[in-house]
């Protein structure tokens, strides 16, 4: 019986994507565009949180948003109404974006004219964490109704996070959710990651996050000037 040749396609695919993501990250850095990847479950409040962030940062930064979904343009229309450039990326049934899809989106939105680009990734706590988009930061949004145990159940997502927003804190009294416990669970996965409790509905808590994000952008600009 002939031997069956086995190809580890996933490992090769991820390695190729990682290399492309590193190239894209360097291109964006040299261009002067900061790129942020937002990840979460569906319904956790990515779009509503983005609206709060945009309102606080659009006077200082030229902002663009790429909305990734399997179908529809609802989120892109919502963001465009906030007064920033927005495009919709349809993933053709895929549950994530990779570096090449990011590159296509960044070209389409005209990232060379922007200081800050947000990618609202497909709503999913599994696939998006596996693929490097070339972003400078990965920001994870976890909402109170999802429960404080999600960092234990989806470790890779929180290991990849550079910051975590805990959204819908205005609804905490309605759910069995502990802010202290969720922070402990997050830091079990990544001890140094900053956690920001927010409420997109009430507009609370975003000043601290926007201040932190502005600081990250400034650090990159200073590093680029020194290199």
Residue ranges, per PLM feature:
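A short, terminal or domain-edge coil/loop segment
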Residues: 90, 118-127, 140-150, 172-176, ...
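Canonical P-loop GTPase G-domain recognition
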Residues: 171-227
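Short secondary-structure transition/capping segments
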Residues: 14, 112-119, 162-170, 213-222
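Nucleotide-state-sensitive switch-loop elements of NTP-binding domains
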Residues: 3-26, 31-39, 44, 48, ...
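Surface-exposed beta-strand edges and their flanking turn/coil or helix-capping segments
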Residues: 51, 78, 100-102, 141, ...
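Conserved C-terminal guanine-recognition region of P-loop GTPase G domains, centered on the G4
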Residues: 128-135, 144-192
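Conserved strand-to-helix beginnings and helix N-cap segments that scaffold or border functional pockets
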Residues: 47, 76, 99-100, 151, ...
């Amino acid at each position: 019986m002939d031997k069956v040749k086995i190809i580890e396609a996933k490992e090769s695919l991820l390695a190729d994507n990682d290399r492309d993501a590193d190239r894209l990250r360097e291109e964006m850095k040299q261009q002067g565009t900061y790129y942020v990847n937002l990840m979460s479950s569906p319904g956790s409040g990515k779009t509503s949180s983005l609206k709060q962030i945009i309102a606080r940062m659009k006077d200082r930064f030229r902002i663009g948003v790429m909305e990734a979904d399997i179908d529809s343009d609802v989120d892109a229309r919502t963001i465009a109404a906030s007064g920033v450039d927005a495009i919709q990326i349809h993933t053709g049934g895929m549950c994530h974006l990779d570096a090449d899809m990011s590159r296509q989106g960044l070209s389409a939105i005209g990232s060379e004219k922007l200081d800050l680009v947000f990618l609202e990734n497909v709503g999913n706590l599994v696939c998006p964490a596996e693929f490097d988009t070339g972003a400078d930061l990965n920001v994870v949004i976890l909402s109170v109704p999802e429960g404080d145990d999600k960092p234990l159940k989806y470790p890779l997502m929180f290991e990849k996070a550079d910051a975590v927003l805990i959204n819908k804190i205005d609804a905490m009294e309605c759910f069995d959710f502990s802010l202290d416990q969720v922070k402990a669970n997050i830091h079990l996965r990544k001890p140094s990651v900053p956690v920001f409790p927010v409420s997109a509905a009430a507009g609370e808590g975003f000043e601290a996050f926007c201040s932190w994000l502005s600081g990250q952008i400034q650090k990159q600009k200073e590093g680029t000037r020194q290199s």
